């Protein structure tokens, strides 16, 4: 019998939050544990039923107040190491030395070398990168699932009156994968995905009859279970400024959206707007009951960058591909090879990573065509050349986008993404101008 995570947690007598945190603490692939619409996989069901007592202990511990001393005594590890892990991963939850939410004794023990092989025995080897639905971002996946809970769990509406979202904004720097996550949301709640084309934003004449975005929305409202995706949401829904040239089409879209948004929940319609930043968006749009679900989409962290580099280098290659043989000869078919390069790619977007791998593939092919051997060395020289080429999008404007995004993510959801936000702050700091503190842009690119 297929069960969603909410139903299954009740059956186990373990909180849903604990199951989600457990998957993150033990670095399990989401696709090994949950289907795209958050149903429990057979593999995870078998593990959970056979280890129900362990999960209950994990659940009890997660919700129990404890100090670093308590954790140290329980797992026989130095208090200083435990405090360092907590400070690195949960910088926002210090409260007089007592920890509760999100702090698992078992999770810390696992990071410090505790033996939990019995867990991994159920899942075999890690799912190959090329077979994964997405790489990393477990924290973002579960944050989104929490935001979508009214869609996934009707009991929230029936017993608590919690409304489904009518509008969602996914926001983040250019190239961070906002459309990917919008499609992932549609998949998670089993809605059809429609991307609004630029032509549909304009009022045009067809057979002497004017058609508008309002008419387009009227047609969509006749459908059921639809995600409407609107790119450049921050530009289209911008608050009017004095002496600003008004884009009449954008104003029509804004007014039509505000007029119809109350109908969205009733008709099972959700509009997702994609924005670089939230500042400047018309306040009426962000009002409760409208676009009040805000989902930050971060550039990948260092580990995610290494995994993405390997994924993009091996994507669509068959087992006899020449490039794959060259990668294997250099041990570049494994994540450790890419860690040094990933370390240098501070605040790189997903798009920049793809640009890097495309550039590197071309350079490797050029060397192969010249030397006709699979024994080519993937040297630091060609890695650095590809890195420099892909960094062309790392402009002052992009870095300012990242800084604004960080400010907004910190204001809206620091409690859920504290470690990711602090890491990104440190990476951004490496680009800040040291000699010209008065500059308005405040960033430069270090050329090596």
Language-model regions: role of each:
Residues 5-6, 16, 20, 68-69, ...:
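An amphipathic alpha-helix signature
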Residues 338-352:
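A short helix-loop-helix "switch/interaction" segment in the helical subdomain of ASCE P-loop NTPases
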Residues 129-336, 448:
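Walker A/P-loop NTP-binding motif of AAA+ ATPase domains
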Residues 1-13, 57-70:
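Primarily a LysM-type cell-wall glycan-binding module
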Residues 80-127:
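Interdomain "pre-motor" coupling segment immediately N-terminal to P-loop NTPase/helicase cores
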Residues 158-160, 348-354, 367-448:
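C-terminal engagement/docking regions of AAA+ P-loop ATPases
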Residues 20-51, 83-102:
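Short, Lys/Arg-enriched alpha-helical microdomains
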Residues 47-64, 394-398:
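A short, Lys/Arg-enriched interface patch at domain edges and termini
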């Amino acid at each position: 019998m297929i069960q969603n995570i909410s139903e299954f947690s009740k059956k186990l007598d373990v909180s849903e939050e604990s199951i989600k945190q457990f998957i993150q603490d033990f670095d399990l692939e989401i696709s090994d544990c949950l289907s795209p619409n958050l149903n429990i996989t057979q593999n995870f069901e078998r593990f959970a039923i056979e280890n129900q007592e362990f999960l209950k202990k994990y659940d009890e511990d997660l919700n129990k107040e404890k100090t670093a001393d308590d954790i140290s005594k329980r797992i026989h590890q130095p208090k200083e190491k435990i405090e360092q892990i907590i400070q690195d991963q949960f910088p926002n939850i210090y409260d007089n030395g007592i920890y509760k939410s999100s702090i698992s004794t078992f999770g810390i023990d696992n990071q410090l070398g505790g033996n939990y092989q019995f867990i991994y025995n159920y899942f075999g080897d890690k799912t190959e990168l090329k077979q994964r639905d997405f790489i990393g971002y477990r924290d973002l996946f579960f944050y989104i699932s929490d935001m979508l809970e009214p869609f996934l769990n009707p009991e929230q509406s029936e017993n608590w009156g919690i409304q489904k979202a009518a509008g969602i904004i996914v926001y983040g720097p250019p190239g961070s994968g906002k459309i990917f996550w919008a499609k992932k949301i549609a998949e998670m709640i089993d809605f059809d995905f429609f991307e609004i084309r630029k032509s549909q934003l304009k009022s045009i004449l067809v057979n002497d009859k004017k058609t508008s975005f309002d008419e387009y929305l009227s047609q969509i409202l006749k459908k059921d279970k639809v995600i409407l995706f609107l790119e450049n949401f921050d530009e289209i829904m911008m608050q009017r400024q004095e002496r600003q040239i008004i884009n009449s089409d954008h104003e029509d879209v804004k007014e039509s959206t505000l007029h119809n948004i109350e109908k969205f929940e009733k008709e099972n319609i959700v509009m997702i707007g994609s924005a670089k930043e939230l500042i400047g968006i018309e306040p009426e749009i962000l009002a409760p009951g409208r676009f009040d679900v805000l989902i930050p989409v971060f550039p990948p962290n260092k580990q995610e960058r290494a995994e993405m580099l390997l994924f993009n280098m091996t994507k669509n290659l068959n087992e006899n591909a020449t490039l794959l043989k060259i990668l294997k000869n250099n041990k570049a078919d494994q994540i450790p090879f890419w860690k040094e390069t990933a370390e240098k790619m501070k605040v790189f977007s997903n798009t920049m990573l793809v640009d890097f791998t495309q550039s590197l593939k071309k350079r490797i092919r050029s060397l192969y065509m010249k030397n006709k051997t699979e024994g080519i060395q993937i040297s630091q020289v060609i890695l650095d050349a590809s890195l420099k080429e892909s960094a062309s999008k790392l402009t002052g404007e992009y870095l300012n986008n990242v800084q604004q995004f960080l400010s907004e993510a910190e204001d809206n959801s620091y409690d859920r993404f504290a470690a990711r936000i602090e890491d990104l702050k440190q990476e951004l700091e490496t680009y800040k101008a040291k000699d010209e503190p008065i500059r308005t842009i405040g960033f430069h690119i270090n050329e090596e």
